[in-house]
């Protein structure tokens, strides 16, 4: 089997297409994993697009978080082999049996997708748009694409919904900040160092080109960061200097506005799920989104406990 080429297998009650190529409007090819019912048909799609390496198991990427969650909430693991659990996105084993297709796309420059990493940028948002429209016209799709995910996978839903993709039918923003300046980089006008630390720990470790220095999938044993192994200077040239960029924009300027929600443009039916904790990041975005989005159909829920626990429980 050629490494990191599209391939299909049937296992655990699903038809799985690994590393499906998805071509962007500038010609760059991203890679997606598609989990779908074994039977033929056209089904609604749940899509996520983000930087955490689609093939990296939750248990391998975030072992302490996984262990705490399953010890305190053992129902998380019920009804699933948990082989396909991945950080902050849906478990396909719990959705595919209900006739959904689950699509996970590695964002530009991350996981198995090459390119330049520039988080929450207009380029990334356009990629997300292209992925939604791609999913909406596939032979296994009924043309209705929903978005669902936590944190990063929620934040970028606000952004892409502002572009109004024709095939976007609904969105579930689970703990997703919205105002790049106020929620994320400058709390009360004061610089937050969270993003620089996050970049080092959660993005650089799964950047495309980490290759043999990265992890392998516990499902298919392929490298989760693509077939190439790039040098440190090559990797650095393929990503924005995120912490420096944020620090160089101390005011709420065009840099921040380009990475923030445009509420009057968001008309998609939405479910906004906030956490009473995590005050330094997400809750404001969820409440603001519910109040200010132009969507006619919108719902708000607020929960406690950890960042992700309720998302994975029934």
List PLM regions with ranges.
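Catalytic histidine neighborhood in serine/cysteine hydrolases
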Residues: 293-308
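N-terminal cap/lid segment of alpha/beta-hydrolase-fold proteins
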Residues: 3-41, 45
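Accessory cap/linker subdomain of secreted extracellular hydrolases
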Residues: 55, 59, 63-81, 85-92, ...
């Amino acid at each position: 089997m050629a490494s990191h080429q599209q391939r299909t297998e049937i296992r655990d009650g699903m038809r799985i297409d690994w590393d499906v190529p998805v071509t962007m409007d500038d010609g760059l090819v991203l890679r997606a994993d598609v989990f779908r019912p074994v039977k033929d048909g056209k089904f609604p799609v749940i899509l996520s697009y983000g930087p955490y390496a689609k093939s990296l198991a939750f248990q391998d990427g975030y072992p302490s978080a996984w262990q705490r969650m399953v010890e305190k909430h053992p129902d998380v693991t019920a009804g699933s082999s948990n082989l396909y659990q991945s950080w902050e996105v849906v478990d396909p084993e719990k959705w595919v049996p209900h006739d959904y297709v689950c699509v996970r796309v590695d964002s530009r420059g991350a996981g198995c997708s090459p390119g330049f990493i520039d988080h929450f940028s207009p380029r990334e948002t356009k990629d997300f748009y292209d992925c939604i429209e791609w999913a909406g016209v596939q032979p296994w799709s009924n043309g209705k694409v929903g978005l669902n995910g936590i944190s990063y996978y929620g934040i970028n839903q606000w952004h892409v919904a502002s572009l109004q993709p024709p095939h976007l039918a609904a969105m579930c923003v689970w703990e997703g900040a919205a105002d790049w300046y106020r929620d994320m980089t400058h709390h009360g006008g004061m610089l937050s160092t969270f993003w620089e630390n996050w970049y080092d720990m959660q993005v650089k470790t799964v950047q495309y080109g980490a290759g043999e220095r990265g992890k392998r999938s516990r499902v298919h044993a392929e490298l989760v960061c693509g077939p190439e192994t790039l040098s440190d200077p090559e990797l650095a040239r393929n990503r924005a200097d995120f912490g420096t960029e944020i620090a160089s924009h101390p005011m709420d300027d065009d840099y921040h506005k380009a990475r923030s929600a445009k509420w009057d443009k968001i008309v998609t039916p939405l479910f906004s799920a906030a956490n009473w904790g995590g005050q330094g990041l997400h809750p404001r975005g969820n409440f603001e989104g519910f109040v200010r989005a132009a969507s006619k159909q919108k719902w708000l829920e607020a929960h406690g406990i950890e960042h992700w626990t309720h998302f994975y429980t029934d």
